[in-house]
């Protein structure tokens, strides 16, 4: 492999470069299909391109095929998933720590439950406990995407439903 480069949206600023490996190209979405144009500028139009077909919709695949007509596209979904199943010691430690942090959040959730307590307050208590624990375990890190799903009533019909002010 000659180079490693990520292509990310302008809204993410420099974070993909800071948190990633290799170089990073930032594109704007001011014009339609700028992402695909950025991909075209980075990929030789005569090679073999691996794509996870289970992660790209038909329309976007067609855009890539149009922009790179001399390239061969290959489905790498299965081999990529097999590679993801192999974990390094560092990844296993992260998974263990994540499970322990989730247990702390679950205990905080149970601790906050009470008659008349809105579900959003219970979720906030749980999330705060987890964020504090993550900050303790990983000082100097960026903390993002940590939250608690704590739904009741009709919102229990789906995993990604929002918390509410229901008591």
Annotate each PLM feature.
Residues 1-105:
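A composition/biophysics-driven feature that prefers long, compositionally simple stretches
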Residues 9-15, 111, 133-139:
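A broad, low-specificity signal for short, low-complexity segments enriched in glycine/proline
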Residues 53, 110-119:
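Conserved short loop/turn motifs at secondary-structure junctions
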Residues 67, 77-79, 119-167:
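Short catalytic-site patches enriched in acidic/histidine residues
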Residues 87-90, 117, 121:
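A structural signal for alpha-helical segments
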Residues 99-109, 119-127:
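Active-site pocket-lining segments that scaffold enzyme catalytic pockets across diverse folds
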């Amino acid at each position: 492999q000659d180079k490693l480069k990520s292509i990310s949206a302008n809204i993410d600023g420099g974070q993909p470069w800071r948190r990633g490996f290799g170089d990073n190209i930032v594109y704007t979405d001011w014009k339609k299909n700028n992402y695909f144009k950025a991909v075209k500028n980075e990929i030789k139009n005569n090679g073999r391109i691996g794509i996870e077909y289970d992660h790209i919709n038909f329309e976007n695949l067609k855009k890539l095929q149009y922009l790179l007509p001399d390239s061969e596209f290959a489905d790498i979904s299965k081999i990529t998933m097999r590679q993801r199943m192999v974990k390094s010691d560092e990844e296993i430690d992260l998974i263990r720590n994540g499970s322990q942090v989730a247990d702390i959040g679950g205990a905080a959730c149970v601790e906050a439950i009470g008659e008349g307590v809105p579900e959003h307050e219970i979720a906030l208590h749980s999330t705060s406990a987890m964020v504090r624990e993550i900050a303790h375990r990983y000082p100097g890190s960026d903390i993002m995407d940590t939250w608690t799903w704590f739904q009741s009533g009709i919102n229990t019909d789906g995993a990604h439903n929002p918390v509410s002010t229901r008591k």
